[in-house]
Amino acid sequence: MEVTSTTFISTTRSSKYLTLTSYSPVILPASTLRRDFLGCCHSLRPSPHLRTRAGKRNSRRSSIRSPRLVVRASIDSGLILIVVAVTAFSAIAFAYCQSTFRKRKSSDEVATVHGGKNSAENRREIHGDIHEGNPVEINVGFRKVEEESVNLLEEEKAHQIHEVAVMDYDSVSAEDSQFAVASVTTVATAHTLIDESFSSSIVNGSVALESATFGVKTPEKQVGNSEDQKGLEHDFSQAVVGIHSIASPQVVDDTRALEYEYNGLLQKPLEYSIFAESKREEIHTFYGSNHSSAKSSRLPSLKAVSPAVTSATNSLFLDHKNNGVIDTQFPGQSSGQATGDVQEENLVAHSNGGVSHIRKDVKGDWKFPSDGKHVGHQIDESMPQFPARNFELHNSNGRSPETSDAYNRLLRDGRIKDCISLLEDLDQRDLLDMDKIYHASFFKACKKQRAVKEAFRFTKLILNPTMSTFNMLMSVCASSQDIEGARGVLRLVQESGMTADCKLYTTLISSCAKSGKVDAMFEVFHQMSNSGVEANLHTFGALIDGCARAGQVAKAFGAYGILRSKNVKPDRVVFNALISACGQSGAVDRAFDVLAEMKAETHPIDPDHISIGALMKACCNAGQVERAKEVYQMIHKYGIRGTPEVYTIAVNSCSKSGDWDFACSIYKDMKEKDVTPDEVFFSALIDVAGHAKMLDEAFGILQDAKSQGIRLGTISYSSLMGACCNAKDWKKALELYEKIKSIKLRPTISTMNALITALCEGNQLPKAMEYLDEIKTLGLKPNTITYSMLMLASERKDDFEVSFKLLSQAKGDGVSPNLIMCRCITSLCKRRFEKACAGGEPVVSFKSGRPQIENKWTSMALMVYRETISGGTVPTTEVVSQVLGCLQLPHDAALRDRLISTLGINISSQKQHNIFPLVDGFGEYDPRAFSLLEEATSLGVLPSVSFNKIPLFFDTTELPKNVAEVYLLTIFKGLKHRLAAGAKIPHINLIISIQEKEIRTPEGEKTIDLTGRVGQEIGALLRRLDIPYHRKDSRLRINGVSLKNWFQPKLDSPFSGGKPGDLRSSQVPLGNQISRQQRSIRLGNLSLE
């Protein structure tokens, strides 16, 4: 059965108003007619509080019925002439728009879909002509009029049209709703009934009403991520709405989900309805295509309702935020297309009735995939078809709404560089309006990503930046700890002619504080004072916080004194910063003084959880664990609920001591105060259990955290692996590692280090080496801790090959030898060197004319030691002693004879020991040992001895064996040079360690003093050198005269025929000459005669 569509226009007269009613088609009875707003597929219903459930059900049922259109308008009879004028003006405007499109060489294409094929016979062009037939076309759009004369004319007519175009609905029509419509054209057929009174205003069966446009300007658009937004501000200053309606006997549900992509961002269209608030009831104003008449006073606001799915009405809406297009499709006809800022649009018919959209934009490519299924309406081929048109839509500044939407999407995704590139591109084309960009959102994104350069580029795009803009830019620099950037902001402020305010200086001070630049911080403060800007409480808080971060408690209290001198009342934040400064420097008593000062204020300030946490940290840094427990009790005293952070600090305070009971009480307090623990707290609790050797409790804590729904990650499992390491249970550690792999959790290097440490402690070095290779397969990089633990295990097993292999791998991975690695290598080298000496291997060479150690183990020890200290590591006395042990000469008769022959002197066999003062190193150590000891003294490893004190004191109680011996020989070497210069030799007092021990004798138990190991070695050294000494209690005394005689041994004179002589008699002329030279220097006689 074929159904034709008929449009009726009827008029009724009242005493004052004419009522015009138009509807099409007449398929349904009048009682079922729905109140539809012109240009919108949603029904206009009363306010939600006036609707009943029955009404809602009726509206849902009515949404699936056949299409019809009802237009009712109440027009004052006195304004009929104005309607005629409006009609004429609309025709002129329409003709002008058509001529504009022709000048732009825009081609009109006719795309008619008939079951998936194009019909060339049905293509017709519409250029202002009125077509016969049943279709009703309603085109609603805003067009831009460029000529100034037309704009002025349209502005004159805007207010008149505003009063004329009023539609009168029934009393149940929706209250407080206004809509923007550009042009209304009703095309009627020959069956249309027209009132005679309106025949003069209708040309060829058409009635046109136009009014002024309106727009809502939103200079700053808030970027949000919520999917349930109920109110959004939109820019509708220019929009195009194309509505085509063709009667059809069928109603087919057609909700097509279009997806398009811009720069890789997937977007989906939304269906929505638009409502605006109004104080007038049952009056809806229609506006025409006049763009120059900007805003109507009767439309105070425009709001968009949240998206809703309306598949029953078979309408398709493109999201205005994405395309700037509202495309409404009535049942029975494919939707007309209207685009914003689009250069080309092609409609391609498919066999299934679908339409493939391909659009090319100015800025980017918007792609509409053709995989979305679209069920087209079956259209009678006899019906005339209207061609789809291409429109270019721009905002008032020539920028497409799609550009702003693209910027907002990029900003939401955190693509700051793409955002700034887009804005700079618009600026080059003179299309950028920074007033419509929300500045705070961009600076906030830069602050999160520490994008200082992008923030400066954004600021340069702002034509007239304010002090608020510079403050936001300074905040970005402060969060990024970029001092140079912060100073650059200050220069920009000065160059712009503005005076920096207190907030800007405070942010700059905070930036210096976060970077640890205390001097720069105070420099800015003095600059601020010299500029006449008064510092406030936040400024002093930033100063004190910077001093606290650097641990400079004196400067922190200095800033506090300035605060007091300026009569600025400190708050809790300032006091907390002072307590933190005291904690960093270990001044616990000073921190408690600050707490007492808080309570002594005129209005006492009670500590909060930050104060308690800072005090507990101060106690922990000073090693006062018991005092930290007392501070924790203040939480109950002051009724502080606290946060997980302060409870974590309390648990960490008892970690080293392994006080499991106190940690459990803290956990209990958290539960009582309903404080939800986080993963960091559970990790600290597991660490305490590990130090307490309670491994089962540690695993129980992990299960407890899971039962509470805490999402556990690498922090918790690393702490649990550390607990296994502390408990020295390598089997549990392996089980835990397998569990970590089973849950597909990627372990960190700290987790693997704890596993390797547990294996090394369990004497499982081969397995530990296997997991070293597995670290690299996991994509992790071994660090210093990894190689240190492995080297310690190899050193305990005396496996030099493994240690040397690890050292080579460490160098390959870019890990420099640290103190532990150096100590392990030097210890292994010393053992092998001593073994070589004991086995009689030749280790001494006389190639240089003096005795020198030449051995591979000594060379290896010296090499690792040099690499360690060259990296900035300060060695310990133990490491220095091990290296010196590799430079000690062996004590055998063969070496002594070789030394005598090298000297080339004759000595009696009874006085062989007197030759040692004449040998470099005194025959005990390689001469390089003295240089190494002097270097260690310069690094602060060993104390220095002053020769100006008489007698000399040398304490050996805290020194290792080799260090004590070389140190004493170094003193002898210095005294020998002083003796050659004519100085007197002082007495030497050596302090050695003494141990008391009880022994049993026939007379009973007695307590005797035993010399320590170092004292015994020094005594043996003096006896080998034949230096007389006297022991009294813990002191060894060497007489200066005896030492002088030892420096001048008696040798056989080469002129006495082998008789022993005195070395002093043969050296008298040389000694007299040296004395004369010294006397001449003292008298100032420097002549060369």
Swiss-Prot record:
PROSITE patterns from the UniProt entry: PPR
Superkingdom of the source species: Eukaryota
Transit peptide interval: 1-72
InterPro entries named among the record's database cross-references: Chloroplast_PPR (IPR053303), Pentatricopeptide_rpt (IPR002885), PROP1-like_PPR_dom (IPR033443), TPR-like_helical_dom_sf (IPR011990)
Subcellular location: Plastid, Chloroplast
UniProt keyword terms in alphabetical order: Chloroplast, Plastid, Repeat, Transit peptide
Tissues expressing the protein: Expressed in stems, leaves and sepals.
PPR repeat residue numbers: 466-500, 501-535, 536-570, 571-605, 608-642, 643-677, 678-712, 713-747, 748-782, 783-817
Pfam families, alphabetized: PPR_long
Disruption phenotype: No visible phenotype. RuBisCO content only slightly reduced.
Cellular component annotations (GO), alphabetically ordered: chloroplast
Any GO BP annotation: mRNA stabilization
Physiological role: Regulator of the large subunit (LS) of RuBisCO. Involved either in the processing or in the stabilization of the processed transcript, probably by acting as a barrier to the 5'>3' degradation.
Family: Belongs to the PPR family. P subfamily.
Name recorded for this polypeptide: Pentatricopeptide repeat-containing protein MRL1, chloroplastic
Source species of the chain: Arabidopsis thaliana (Mouse-ear cress)
Lineage: Eukaryota, Viridiplantae, Streptophyta, Embryophyta, Tracheophyta
